[in-house]
Amino acid sequence: MGIKTNEAEKNEYFTALKPILNFLTDCIENPPPKSDVIFVFGSTKHYVAEYAAKLYLEKLAPYILISGHKSERCNNLYAKTEADFMKKEIIKLEIPDEKIITEYNASNTLENVIFGMRTLADKNIKINSAILVAKPFHLKRCLATFKKQFPQVKLSCSSKMTFTEYLSYELTENEKSKNNKTENEVIKRIIGEIDRLIIYAEKGDIVKQDIPENIIIAA
């Protein structure tokens, strides 16, 4: 999909984007069912941590698992890893430390799932069901990865934000931090999820997705 510049082209662009956004977020279930763990994919977004804490406080799961290695933003946030950052944010919301389990080595979605589940097993926490929490556009791939690696686990996906809210948040945060990312760059990152779903399915990392032809063409 080409990037548009003037307002008329921009409106046309966002209209064309809508099916892609709907496809990427159609797995979200709010509120999610009660599960054995809230499984959080590494991030440096405050709202992801806050939402995981909210689900815990609503008694939707007895544990929060956070998986995430170091990212570029960690240095700016005075955190060693994404998991470290998110744990600090969750503890601020008065979640008991012993209910937060961290995994610090995963550097991609596949590792998040494998290392996170291994960490839970090492602590003798049996997982039959999980609520997946991540940025909204990432959740479909998180779900597909989990289904491939642990097909026996019952899964649900949940997100604090709708896709529109997420996009607005990202652009506002970029302005506040004087980030050089443009609206187009944010959108390109999100649309790239379609390619990732195809590529990682071919590698055998995730469950193959039934992606409509119009979505592939639009992306």
What residue spans do the PLM features occupy?
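Extended hydrophobic blocks
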Residues: 1-37, 47, 57, 73-74, ...
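Nuclease catalytic cores that cleave nucleic-acid phosphodiester bonds
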Residues: 111
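Short internal beta-strands
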Residues: 63-71
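Short, solvent-exposed loop/turn segments at secondary-structure boundaries
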Residues: 75-79
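Structural recognition of the beta-strand scaffold that forms the well-ordered cores
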Residues: 39-41, 65-66
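Histidine-anchored nucleotide/phosphate-binding helix
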Residues: 46-64
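Flexible loop residues that form catalytic
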Residues: 43, 69, 135
